[in-house]
Design a protein with these regions (language model features):
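Alpha-helical transmembrane segments and their helix-helix packing motifs
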Residues: 2-263
Length: 263
């Protein structure tokens, strides 16, 4: 009789910390074409997830209360799932993983800043590409959906500085945990489940994600919204700051305090 060997389908927290640090090193060490191509895909995938959110949430009558937001939030995670399972680079998950590798002294500050800068630009191009060609040109973010697109975009640009910062913190605490749990799982189903619920939660709550905003604000602008480029830029800066604090401190920082060894 052959001996039954049980293999865990997940990593223990200490193992997960070391694995995430290695992932951060790999992300920071990638070539320029690696970062640009996967960064474009990362921005585009998040935008497609947001497009699905707008179509679903915008089609539910107001009489059903929060059902539209809940159902929209349920389909949004497809974007991050495509990134974490299929391949892509997302600035918010890199704020967690690459910063963790920096805290673990595996990457330099220069490598960290370079990675965040390049991935942010590539995400922006991917998100705006989807907003224009798959949203505006096709009409999917306009017509019957435009009321939802406009209301969502205006709510983003009209937040105060501190509202935006802490909304960004809450968002990337959850997005960082979505990436963390995806890294934890060893099979595809585990990665999908680990990603789904934290991402669904941040969308249902209404926290702000810098790459998601790279899609929805331009989508509204392409449709004729009275939103200026300066408002868009200001929102990007504020939400980027909040997202960085959430991913770098509440995920990477606290797990480094808990699990970093002296080796």
């Amino acid at each position: 009789m052959s001996e039954y060997i049980h293999t865990k389908a997940y990593l223990e927290p200490q193992e997960l910390y070391e694995y995430t640090s290695k992932k951060g090193v790999a992300k920071a060490s990638g070539s320029l074409k690696y970062m640009l191509s996967l960064g474009f895909l990362g921005g585009a995938f998040i935008a497609v997830g947001y497009l699905a959110y707008l179509k679903v949430a915008g089609s539910i009558p107001h009489e059903f209360g929060g059902l539209g937001g809940l159902l929209g939030a349920a389909v949004f995670p497809i974007g991050l799932i495509c990134i974490l399972v299929g391949g892509g680079e997302l600035i918010t998950s890199n704020m967690m993983a690459v910063t963790l590798a920096f805290f673990n002294k595996k990457v330099s500050l220069r490598m960290l800043v370079k990675n965040l800068f390049i991935i942010t630009l590539a995400n922006l191009v991917g998100a705006v590409f989807v907003a224009y060609f798959l949203g505006h040109v096709t009409g999917l973010t306009e017509g019957a959906t435009f009321a939802k697109t406009l209301a969502t975009a205006e709510s983003k640009v009209n937040t105060t500085f501190w509202q935006g910062v802490f909304s960004g913190v809450g968002c990337n605490w959850l997005v960082g945990m979505g990436a963390w749990l995806s890294f934890c799982a060893k099979d595809v189903s585990g990665k999908i489940i680990g990603t789904w619920f934290p991402i669904m939660t941040f969308v249902a709550v209404g926290f702000q994600h810098v790459v998601a905003n790279m899609f929805v604000i331009p989508a509204a602008m392409f449709g004729g919204a009275n939103i200026t480029l300066m408002q868009f830029f200001n929102n990007m800066c504020v939400i980027f700051l909040g997202n960085f604090l959430g991913g770098a401190i509440l995920v990477a920082g606290l797990y480094t305090i808990a699990y970093k060894t002296n080796n």
